[in-house]
Protein backbone atom coordinates (compact mmCIF):
# COMPACT_ATOMS: atom_id res chain seq x y z
CA UNK A 1 0.00 0.00 0.00
CA UNK A 2 1.57 3.30 -1.00
CA UNK A 3 1.63 6.48 1.01
CA UNK A 4 -1.28 8.25 -0.66
CA UNK A 5 -3.54 5.19 -0.51
CA UNK A 6 -2.79 4.52 3.15
CA UNK A 7 -3.33 8.15 4.07
CA UNK A 8 -6.63 8.10 2.24
CA UNK A 9 -7.85 4.97 4.00
CA UNK A 10 -6.75 6.20 7.42
CA UNK A 11 -8.35 9.58 6.81
CA UNK A 12 -11.60 8.03 5.67
CA UNK A 13 -11.77 5.69 8.65
CA UNK A 14 -10.96 8.49 11.05
CA UNK A 15 -13.82 10.55 9.74
CA UNK A 16 -16.22 7.63 9.81
CA UNK A 17 -15.69 6.78 13.50
CA UNK A 18 -15.79 10.29 14.92
CA UNK A 19 -19.24 9.81 16.40
CA UNK A 20 -20.23 12.22 19.12
CA UNK A 21 -16.71 13.55 19.61
CA UNK A 22 -16.83 16.59 17.39
CA UNK A 23 -19.63 18.97 16.57
CA UNK A 24 -18.46 20.61 13.34
CA UNK A 25 -14.96 21.26 14.72
CA UNK A 26 -12.30 19.42 16.64
CA UNK A 27 -12.27 19.56 20.39
CA UNK A 28 -15.14 21.97 20.73
CA UNK A 29 -18.79 22.68 20.20
CA UNK A 30 -20.87 24.46 17.63
CA UNK A 31 -21.16 27.66 19.59
CA UNK A 32 -17.36 27.96 19.53
CA UNK A 33 -17.36 27.33 15.80
CA UNK A 34 -19.85 30.09 15.03
CA UNK A 35 -18.51 33.56 15.72
CA UNK A 36 -21.75 35.31 14.90
CA UNK A 37 -25.09 34.56 16.42
CA UNK A 38 -25.85 31.67 18.73
CA UNK A 39 -26.27 28.08 17.65
CA UNK A 40 -29.09 26.57 19.63
CA UNK A 41 -31.43 23.61 19.52
CA UNK A 42 -34.74 22.32 20.80
CA UNK A 43 -35.16 19.57 23.38
CA UNK A 44 -36.29 16.07 22.35
CA UNK A 45 -39.65 16.72 24.02
CA UNK A 46 -40.26 19.60 21.60
CA UNK A 47 -39.23 17.56 18.56
CA UNK A 48 -41.62 17.42 15.62
CA UNK A 49 -41.34 16.01 12.12
CA UNK A 50 -39.00 18.14 10.00
CA UNK A 51 -39.33 18.22 6.21
CA UNK A 52 -36.58 20.06 4.34
CA UNK A 53 -35.63 20.51 0.71
CA UNK A 54 -32.07 19.86 -0.51
CA UNK A 55 -31.28 21.20 -3.99
CA UNK A 56 -28.18 19.53 -5.37
CA UNK A 57 -25.40 20.61 -7.70
CA UNK A 58 -25.10 17.01 -8.91
CA UNK A 59 -27.74 14.75 -10.51
CA UNK A 60 -28.94 11.75 -8.53
CA UNK A 61 -27.56 9.38 -11.17
CA UNK A 62 -23.99 10.70 -10.85
CA UNK A 63 -21.76 8.42 -8.80
CA UNK A 64 -20.68 9.94 -5.47
CA UNK A 65 -21.79 13.52 -6.12
CA UNK A 66 -25.36 12.38 -6.70
CA UNK A 67 -25.54 8.90 -5.21
CA UNK A 68 -23.83 10.18 -2.07
CA UNK A 69 -26.59 12.75 -1.69
CA UNK A 70 -29.31 10.14 -2.15
CA UNK A 71 -27.63 7.86 0.40
CA UNK A 72 -27.47 10.79 2.82
CA UNK A 73 -31.19 11.46 2.31
CA UNK A 74 -32.07 7.82 2.97
CA UNK A 75 -29.76 7.39 5.97
CA UNK A 76 -31.16 10.50 7.66
CA UNK A 77 -34.74 9.34 7.14
CA UNK A 78 -34.11 5.83 8.47
CA UNK A 79 -31.96 6.76 11.46
CA UNK A 80 -34.38 9.50 12.55
CA UNK A 81 -37.35 7.12 12.28
CA UNK A 82 -38.90 9.46 9.74
CA UNK A 83 -38.71 12.48 12.05
CA UNK A 84 -36.13 14.28 9.85
CA UNK A 85 -36.65 14.21 6.09
CA UNK A 86 -34.22 16.01 3.77
CA UNK A 87 -35.43 15.60 0.20
CA UNK A 88 -32.85 15.53 -2.60
CA UNK A 89 -33.64 17.55 -5.73
CA UNK A 90 -31.71 17.26 -8.97
CA UNK A 91 -29.96 20.35 -10.39
CA UNK A 92 -32.51 22.77 -11.78
CA UNK A 93 -35.53 21.09 -10.18
CA UNK A 94 -35.62 23.78 -7.50
CA UNK A 95 -32.55 25.89 -8.20
CA UNK A 96 -29.69 26.18 -10.68
CA UNK A 97 -26.57 24.69 -9.05
CA UNK A 98 -24.71 27.98 -8.83
CA UNK A 99 -27.57 29.69 -6.96
CA UNK A 100 -27.69 27.33 -3.98
CA UNK A 101 -25.45 29.45 -1.74
CA UNK A 102 -27.63 32.56 -2.04
CA UNK A 103 -30.84 30.58 -1.59
CA UNK A 104 -29.67 28.82 1.57
CA UNK A 105 -28.21 32.03 2.99
CA UNK A 106 -31.52 33.85 2.47
CA UNK A 107 -33.64 30.97 3.73
CA UNK A 108 -35.26 30.34 0.35
CA UNK A 109 -33.86 26.80 0.57
CA UNK A 110 -33.34 24.91 3.82
CA UNK A 111 -30.21 23.11 2.71
CA UNK A 112 -27.91 22.42 -0.22
CA UNK A 113 -25.81 19.49 -1.47
CA UNK A 114 -22.94 21.08 -3.30
CA UNK A 115 -19.29 22.18 -3.19
CA UNK A 116 -17.83 25.29 -1.59
CA UNK A 117 -15.61 25.74 -4.65
CA UNK A 118 -18.64 27.02 -6.54
CA UNK A 119 -18.63 30.16 -4.38
CA UNK A 120 -15.23 31.37 -5.61
CA UNK A 121 -16.67 34.65 -6.83
CA UNK A 122 -18.54 35.31 -3.58
CA UNK A 123 -16.17 34.17 -0.83
CA UNK A 124 -12.74 33.20 -2.20
CA UNK A 125 -11.57 31.62 1.07
CA UNK A 126 -14.26 28.95 0.90
CA UNK A 127 -12.39 27.33 -1.99
CA UNK A 128 -9.91 25.88 0.51
CA UNK A 129 -12.67 23.61 1.79
CA UNK A 130 -13.34 21.94 -1.55
CA UNK A 131 -9.97 21.27 -3.24
CA UNK A 132 -6.43 22.64 -3.12
CA UNK A 133 -3.99 22.60 -6.05
CA UNK A 134 -0.93 20.49 -5.26
CA UNK A 135 -2.59 20.07 -1.89
CA UNK A 136 -3.00 17.35 0.71
CA UNK A 137 -4.10 13.80 0.18
CA UNK A 138 -7.23 12.56 1.90
CA UNK A 139 -5.70 11.69 5.27
CA UNK A 140 -3.83 14.95 5.59
CA UNK A 141 -6.82 16.97 4.36
CA UNK A 142 -9.27 15.60 6.94
CA UNK A 143 -6.58 15.85 9.62
CA UNK A 144 -6.36 19.59 8.95
CA UNK A 145 -10.13 19.95 8.72
CA UNK A 146 -11.01 18.09 11.92
CA UNK A 147 -7.89 18.60 14.03
CA UNK A 148 -6.00 21.51 12.52
CA UNK A 149 -8.61 24.26 12.62
CA UNK A 150 -9.86 24.00 9.04
CA UNK A 151 -13.44 23.12 9.89
CA UNK A 152 -13.65 25.80 12.56
CA UNK A 153 -12.60 28.46 10.05
CA UNK A 154 -15.07 27.10 7.51
CA UNK A 155 -17.86 27.46 10.07
CA UNK A 156 -16.82 30.98 11.03
CA UNK A 157 -16.85 32.12 7.41
CA UNK A 158 -20.19 30.53 6.59
CA UNK A 159 -21.82 31.86 9.76
CA UNK A 160 -21.27 35.41 8.49
CA UNK A 161 -23.58 34.45 5.64
CA UNK A 162 -26.25 32.83 7.84
CA UNK A 163 -25.16 29.34 6.81
CA UNK A 164 -23.64 26.36 8.60
CA UNK A 165 -21.90 23.70 6.54
CA UNK A 166 -19.71 20.64 6.82
CA UNK A 167 -17.97 18.15 4.51
CA UNK A 168 -20.31 15.30 3.64
CA UNK A 169 -18.62 13.47 0.79
CA UNK A 170 -15.05 13.07 -0.40
CA UNK A 171 -13.43 12.01 -3.65
CA UNK A 172 -9.94 10.80 -4.60
CA UNK A 173 -7.81 12.51 -7.27
CA UNK A 174 -9.56 13.82 -10.35
CA UNK A 175 -8.60 13.88 -13.98
CA UNK A 176 -6.77 17.00 -15.12
CA UNK A 177 -8.66 17.71 -18.31
CA UNK A 178 -10.23 16.60 -21.58
CA UNK A 179 -8.74 18.05 -24.77
CA UNK A 180 -9.48 17.70 -28.46
CA UNK A 181 -5.78 17.40 -29.28
CA UNK A 182 -2.60 16.14 -27.67
CA UNK A 183 -1.03 18.88 -25.55
CA UNK A 184 2.73 18.74 -25.99
CA UNK A 185 3.70 21.83 -24.01
CA UNK A 186 2.29 24.46 -21.67
CA UNK A 187 2.47 26.95 -24.53
CA UNK A 188 -0.21 24.98 -26.39
CA UNK A 189 -2.64 25.69 -23.54
CA UNK A 190 -2.43 29.44 -24.00
CA UNK A 191 -5.56 30.96 -25.47
CA UNK A 192 -7.77 27.93 -24.86
CA UNK A 193 -11.25 28.38 -23.43
CA UNK A 194 -11.67 25.80 -20.69
CA UNK A 195 -14.17 24.90 -18.02
CA UNK A 196 -12.22 24.84 -14.77
CA UNK A 197 -13.12 24.69 -11.09
CA UNK A 198 -11.95 26.39 -7.94
CA UNK A 199 -8.45 27.59 -7.21
CA UNK A 200 -7.10 25.57 -10.11
CA UNK A 201 -8.90 27.95 -12.47
CA UNK A 202 -6.71 30.80 -11.22
CA UNK A 203 -3.63 28.73 -11.98
CA UNK A 204 -4.81 28.05 -15.52
CA UNK A 205 -5.51 31.73 -16.03
CA UNK A 206 -2.00 32.52 -14.85
CA UNK A 207 -0.57 30.42 -17.71
CA UNK A 208 -2.86 31.97 -20.31
CA UNK A 209 -6.02 29.83 -20.33
CA UNK A 210 -9.42 31.55 -20.36
CA UNK A 211 -11.55 29.72 -17.78
CA UNK A 212 -15.26 29.46 -17.09
CA UNK A 213 -17.06 27.91 -14.12
CA UNK A 214 -19.86 25.76 -15.55
CA UNK A 215 -22.09 23.39 -13.58
CA UNK A 216 -21.62 19.70 -14.40
CA UNK A 217 -24.79 19.18 -16.41
CA UNK A 218 -24.04 22.14 -18.66
CA UNK A 219 -20.48 21.17 -19.59
CA UNK A 220 -21.12 18.68 -22.39
CA UNK A 221 -23.30 21.04 -24.48
CA UNK A 222 -20.70 23.79 -24.08
CA UNK A 223 -17.94 21.41 -25.18
CA UNK A 224 -19.94 19.98 -28.06
CA UNK A 225 -20.94 23.41 -29.40
CA UNK A 226 -17.42 24.79 -29.10
CA UNK A 227 -18.30 27.35 -26.44
CA UNK A 228 -15.32 25.87 -24.62
CA UNK A 229 -12.32 24.08 -26.13
CA UNK A 230 -11.56 21.78 -23.20
CA UNK A 231 -12.85 20.86 -19.76
CA UNK A 232 -12.16 19.19 -16.46
CA UNK A 233 -14.86 18.04 -14.09
CA UNK A 234 -14.20 15.09 -11.81
CA UNK A 235 -12.88 11.54 -11.63
CA UNK A 236 -12.97 9.18 -14.62
CA UNK A 237 -16.12 7.39 -13.47
CA UNK A 238 -18.02 10.68 -13.15
CA UNK A 239 -16.58 12.16 -16.35
CA UNK A 240 -17.59 9.02 -18.23
CA UNK A 241 -21.23 9.55 -17.28
CA UNK A 242 -21.14 13.05 -18.74
CA UNK A 243 -19.93 11.86 -22.13
CA UNK A 244 -16.87 14.04 -22.64
CA UNK A 245 -15.23 11.18 -24.56
CA UNK A 246 -17.64 11.77 -27.42
CA UNK A 247 -16.03 15.13 -28.17
CA UNK A 248 -12.53 15.13 -26.66
CA UNK A 249 -10.22 12.16 -27.18
CA UNK A 250 -7.26 13.16 -24.98
CA UNK A 251 -7.63 12.79 -21.20
CA UNK A 252 -4.85 14.10 -18.96
CA UNK A 253 -3.64 13.17 -15.47
CA UNK A 254 -2.83 13.70 -12.63
CA UNK A 255 -5.47 16.04 -11.27
CA UNK A 256 -2.98 18.44 -9.73
CA UNK A 257 -5.78 20.92 -9.05
CA UNK A 258 -7.87 18.46 -7.01
CA UNK A 259 -5.77 15.70 -5.43
CA UNK A 260 -8.60 15.27 -2.92
CA UNK A 261 -12.00 16.95 -3.09
CA UNK A 262 -14.62 17.61 -0.42
CA UNK A 263 -18.32 18.13 -1.04
CA UNK A 264 -20.57 19.84 1.46
CA UNK A 265 -23.98 19.73 3.09
CA UNK A 266 -25.01 23.29 3.90
CA UNK A 267 -27.94 24.46 6.04
CA UNK A 268 -29.58 27.80 6.63
CA UNK A 269 -28.39 28.80 10.11
CA UNK A 270 -31.88 29.67 11.36
CA UNK A 271 -33.17 26.29 10.23
CA UNK A 272 -30.19 24.59 11.86
CA UNK A 273 -30.92 26.32 15.16
CA UNK A 274 -34.47 24.98 15.06
CA UNK A 275 -33.25 21.37 15.16
CA UNK A 276 -32.92 19.28 18.29
CA UNK A 277 -29.40 18.39 19.40
CA UNK A 278 -30.22 14.79 18.50
CA UNK A 279 -30.97 15.69 14.90
CA UNK A 280 -27.90 17.89 14.66
CA UNK A 281 -25.63 15.10 15.81
CA UNK A 282 -27.41 12.65 13.54
CA UNK A 283 -26.55 14.86 10.54
CA UNK A 284 -22.95 15.20 11.72
CA UNK A 285 -22.57 11.46 12.11
CA UNK A 286 -24.15 10.56 8.77
CA UNK A 287 -21.90 13.07 7.01
CA UNK A 288 -18.78 11.57 8.57
CA UNK A 289 -19.83 8.07 7.56
CA UNK A 290 -20.67 9.29 4.07
CA UNK A 291 -17.16 10.73 3.73
CA UNK A 292 -15.65 7.29 4.26
CA UNK A 293 -18.08 5.50 1.94
CA UNK A 294 -17.76 7.94 -0.93
CA UNK A 295 -13.97 8.05 -0.81
CA UNK A 296 -13.71 4.25 -0.80
CA UNK A 297 -16.19 3.97 -3.67
CA UNK A 298 -14.35 6.64 -5.62
CA UNK A 299 -11.02 4.85 -5.43
CA UNK A 300 -12.55 1.47 -6.27
CA UNK A 301 -14.49 2.66 -9.31
CA UNK A 302 -11.74 4.32 -11.33
CA UNK A 303 -9.99 1.41 -13.01
CA UNK A 304 -13.13 -0.03 -14.66
CA UNK A 305 -14.04 3.48 -15.80
CA UNK A 306 -10.59 4.04 -17.31
CA UNK A 307 -10.85 0.75 -19.22
CA UNK A 308 -14.20 1.80 -20.66
CA UNK A 309 -12.90 5.25 -21.55
CA UNK A 310 -9.97 3.73 -23.42
CA UNK A 311 -12.31 1.34 -25.23
CA UNK A 312 -14.16 4.39 -26.54
CA UNK A 313 -11.03 5.59 -28.30
CA UNK A 314 -9.67 8.00 -25.72
CA UNK A 315 -5.91 8.30 -25.20
CA UNK A 316 -4.79 8.65 -21.58
CA UNK A 317 -1.86 10.96 -20.91
CA UNK A 318 0.21 11.94 -17.90
CA UNK A 319 1.55 15.48 -17.76
CA UNK A 320 5.33 15.71 -17.97
CA UNK A 321 7.18 16.72 -14.83
CA UNK A 322 8.19 19.91 -16.63
CA UNK A 323 4.53 20.84 -17.14
CA UNK A 324 3.64 20.00 -13.54
CA UNK A 325 6.53 22.16 -12.32
CA UNK A 326 5.23 25.11 -14.35
CA UNK A 327 1.72 24.63 -12.96
CA UNK A 328 2.97 24.33 -9.39
CA UNK A 329 5.05 27.48 -9.78
CA UNK A 330 1.98 29.30 -11.07
CA UNK A 331 -0.01 28.02 -8.07
CA UNK A 332 2.48 29.46 -5.60
CA UNK A 333 2.22 32.84 -7.33
CA UNK A 334 -1.58 32.71 -7.39
CA UNK A 335 -2.08 31.76 -3.75
CA UNK A 336 0.29 34.45 -2.45
CA UNK A 337 -1.34 37.09 -4.65
CA UNK A 338 -4.82 36.13 -3.45
CA UNK A 339 -3.67 36.10 0.17
CA UNK A 340 -2.31 39.63 -0.21
CA UNK A 341 -5.71 40.83 -1.45
CA UNK A 342 -8.09 39.08 0.96
CA UNK A 343 -7.61 38.89 4.73
CA UNK A 344 -10.00 35.97 5.16
CA UNK A 345 -8.24 34.03 2.41
CA UNK A 346 -4.85 34.81 3.95
CA UNK A 347 -5.94 33.50 7.36
CA UNK A 348 -7.04 30.15 5.97
CA UNK A 349 -3.95 29.82 3.78
CA UNK A 350 -1.66 30.53 6.75
CA UNK A 351 -3.39 27.82 8.77
CA UNK A 352 -3.16 25.25 6.00
CA UNK A 353 0.45 26.07 5.15
CA UNK A 354 1.53 25.83 8.79
CA UNK A 355 -0.27 22.53 9.28
CA UNK A 356 1.26 21.04 6.13
CA UNK A 357 4.76 22.04 7.15
CA UNK A 358 4.36 20.27 10.49
CA UNK A 359 2.54 17.29 9.00
CA UNK A 360 5.37 16.75 6.50
CA UNK A 361 7.71 15.78 9.34
CA UNK A 362 5.35 12.98 10.34
CA UNK A 363 4.43 12.09 6.76
CA UNK A 364 8.05 11.68 5.67
CA UNK A 365 8.86 9.50 8.68
CA UNK A 366 5.70 7.48 8.94
CA UNK A 367 4.73 6.62 5.36
CA UNK A 368 6.36 4.87 2.45
CA UNK A 369 6.65 6.96 -0.71
For the regions a language model picked out, list residue spans one by one.
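N-terminal secretory/targeting leader peptides
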Residues: 2-141, 153, 158-369
